[in-house]
Amino acid sequence: MAIVKFLLIWIILFVTTAALESVEREKLPAAASWTKTGELLAAEATQAAAATKSHVYAISNREVGQYDRKTGRKTAVSTGEAHHLNSGFFWNQKLYLAHSNFPNKPDSSDIRVLDPRDMRLHVLKDFGKSEGSLTWVVRHKGDWWCMFVYYGDQNHKSYLVRFDDHWQEKSRWTFPQEVLGRLGKMSISGGLWKDGGFWVSGHDERELYRVRLPKAGSVLEYVETVPAPFTGQGIAEDPLTGGLVGIDRKERKIVFSELER
């Protein structure tokens, strides 16, 4: 009887776990939506997008294209070596980009900076051999916040780390299962600070996840999953509208979006 009881409990746990994993991958209802408000063709729109009030920037593995917001015309392309550029964000009139040697091993990451006046890429901070690949970086509360990711069965090890201006680690957090369960074998590709927390994106899904810093512990607190017009990848804030810019990778487009509740 004890063996039968044990087997029944095991079967119930197995079925329940499988059902929960299935629900995680379903499209979740949301009380909000990031709605597309515009788009712009950009050959470099394969990794991420960023914006100023006058221009938008399409980011590919190796270069950044600058486009006039009003005309949609390409006005410049970056110079300087790059292997795998990821998300970018503007700070003090310069574009800061996560960069790594992905998919090569061992992992190596750095932050590159681009001045729109000369469109030259150069290294700001070289992490050397890193624990995971750097996919996005932002500034918040006077510190650097950097996302290092793992893929496949190891993607649960992906973490957000907070550095001071001397690149001393202050804290790090992993992601909640509500987010990890929707990434498949991929990981966190983009992120930014907004609305009292972080909006982050996956690699492919047309949705964004909002998380915030926990009051205690080392796991970020899940807030919500919201539909979005971006096909995953890097996102950035749009200073002109207060919305976001991202990409449609397949269509090679920069996509503009605003939050509707």
Region spans (language model):
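Conserved blade-ending motifs and adjacent loop-strand segments that build the rim/top face
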Residues: 219-238
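Surface loop/turn motifs at the tips and blade-to-blade linkers of beta-strand repeat domains
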Residues: 37-42, 77-81, 125-130, 173-184, ...
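Short loop/turn segments that connect beta-strands within beta-propeller blades
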Residues: 68-72, 115-119, 164-168, 212-217, ...
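Structural motif
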Residues: 65, 104-112, 154-161, 206-211, ...
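Blade-loop segments of beta-propeller domains
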Residues: 72-109, 124
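Beta-strand-rich domains and repeat architectures in extracellular enzymes and scaffolds
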Residues: 35-62, 84-87
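Beta-rich catalytic cores
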Residues: 44-45, 83-84, 107, 131-134, ...
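Short coil/turn segments that connect the beta-strands within blades of beta-propeller domains
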Residues: 53-54, 92-93, 141-143, 195-196, ...
